[in-house]
Every structure is written in C-alpha cells, then in structure tokens.
Design a protein with these regions (language model features):
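Long, positively charged amphipathic alpha-helical accessory segments at protein N-termini or as interdomain linkers
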Residues: 3-5, 14, 24, 65-68, ...
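A short coil-to-beta-strand element that immediately follows conserved catalytic motifs
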Residues: 31, 91-95
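Basic side chains
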Residues: 42-44, 95, 220
Length: 228
C-alpha cells in the first residue's frame, strides 16, 4: 500500500502521475490519495462535493479484474458501514447505490471512476466522510453524532488500514446484497433518464447489484439512476 497526502488539491481523483507509472504502482499495491481539503470535489454525475477542512477525502486506486469494477462501489460502502458499526457502534443507513446516511442525513459518499483495458480495470474510488463538519443542510458529521472532534490524520489512517485489510477478504455477492438490503433506505423518489421523476416503491438490491423497483404496478430492475 502507498499513500500520498496533500494539504489541498482540486480532487483526490485527479491524476498526479503519468499513466504508465500509475500502472506500475498498482501492479502489486493499492494507492491512496488523501487531501485535507478539496477545491473541486465531485460526486456522482456532475454533482459537487463540498470539501472544507475537517473531513476525510480520499481516493483508493486499485487494479482489479474488469468484472469486479461494478461491484467495487457497493463493497466500499459495505466496508465503511462496517467501520462505523465496529468502531463507533453506529448503524448507518444505506442509500443505493453509493451513499451512507443517519436519520435521513448524509454522512458519507462513494464515487467510482474506471479505466478498463482488456480484462483489467483501473479504479479510482473516491470517498468523502463527514467527520468534524456537516457542510450542507441535509448532512451530518461524526462530531454531530458523538459530540467529539477527531484528529483527521489519525482517524484516516485507521480507516485506510481497515479498508486495506477488508479488501483482502472474500465476500460473496449474496452476503453483500443481504447486508445492503438490511440497512437500505426505501423512502426515496427516482430521478431516471427513462422513467423520469416518479414516485416508486423501492423493493430490494438484486444479486447483480441492480435495484428492484415497482413503478406503475410494474416491477423493474435498474442499474443506474438517482434516488432523491
């Protein structure tokens, strides 16, 4: 494992080295890029992630089989959820496909960018976790839950070690999906390019990690879209 840390950067998902050297590093190691502040942090699609000093912003760079690329987003959410449960006795709620909430307020988000070359994928998994600040109205921080400020560098090192250890473990899709369904929030509307903005019934995450919904008395499986 390698880690690079910045005081400030546009985004931890930015390229900091040439792609050939990047591939060499990822041949045998994961690369973690962290910054205490992001100037242009991004979420899913064109969304911006407010990134003031006091929270954790990092990107995990990995080389995986191309077939694992889709799953990684969900697995990282699962790992972060487990971290909060084990270390703080906090059971977060899961919002498909890549956010974690507590009492309807967002505390963490995951966004993945991938480059697929043949059977290999190079993944940049961005993670934002509200630790000492909750930068938007509908968000919450760890400080807001436990009423205690955290040292960002110390806590991020603990989280990275937890993630790195967890990534060495095998977990079946069945177990992952069962876990996600257990904690999934189901009271969102759908914003989707095909189905539009409709009131839906969220049923479950399928084993292929699509979302099963009910719309106009019809069951649909969607692989992308936004819950709002």
């Amino acid at each position: 494992m390698y880690k690079v840390i910045f005081d400030s950067i546009n985004s931890t998902q930015d390229e900091i080295i040439g792609f050939n050297n990047y591939k060499k590093i990822l041949k045998n190691n994961n690369l973690y890029i962290q910054s205490f502040r992001q100037i242009k942090g991004t979420g899913r699609g064109k969304k911006k992630w407010s990134s003031p000093i006091g929270n954790i912003y990092l990107t995990i760079n990995q080389k995986l089989k191309a077939s694992y690329a889709l799953r990684n987003n969900f697995y990282i959410c699962y790992i972060i959820h487990k971290f909060f449960k084990i270390n703080f006795n906090i059971n977060l709620d899961y919002k498909w496909p890549n956010d974690l909430f507590l009492k309807n307020k967002k505390i963490a988000g995951v966004v993945v960018k991938s480059t697929i070359l043949g059977k290999k994928s190079y993944l940049k998994t961005g993670i934002g976790i509200n630790i000492n600040n909750s930068p938007i109205v509908d968000s919450v921080s760890l400080f807001g839950i436990i009423n205690k400020k955290s040292n960002i560098l110390d806590l991020s090192n603990i989280i990275i070690d937890f993630i790195e250890h967890s990534l060495t473990k095998k977990i079946s899709n069945k177990k992952l999906v069962r876990y996600l369904n257990k904690y999934m929030i189901r009271d969102f509307k759908l914003n989707h390019p095909i189905f539009g903005k409709n009131i839906i019934e969220i049923l479950s995450v399928n084993e292929d990690l699509s979302l099963k919904i009910k719309i106009d008395d019809t069951i649909k499986n969607i692989f992308f879209g936004e819950l709002v």
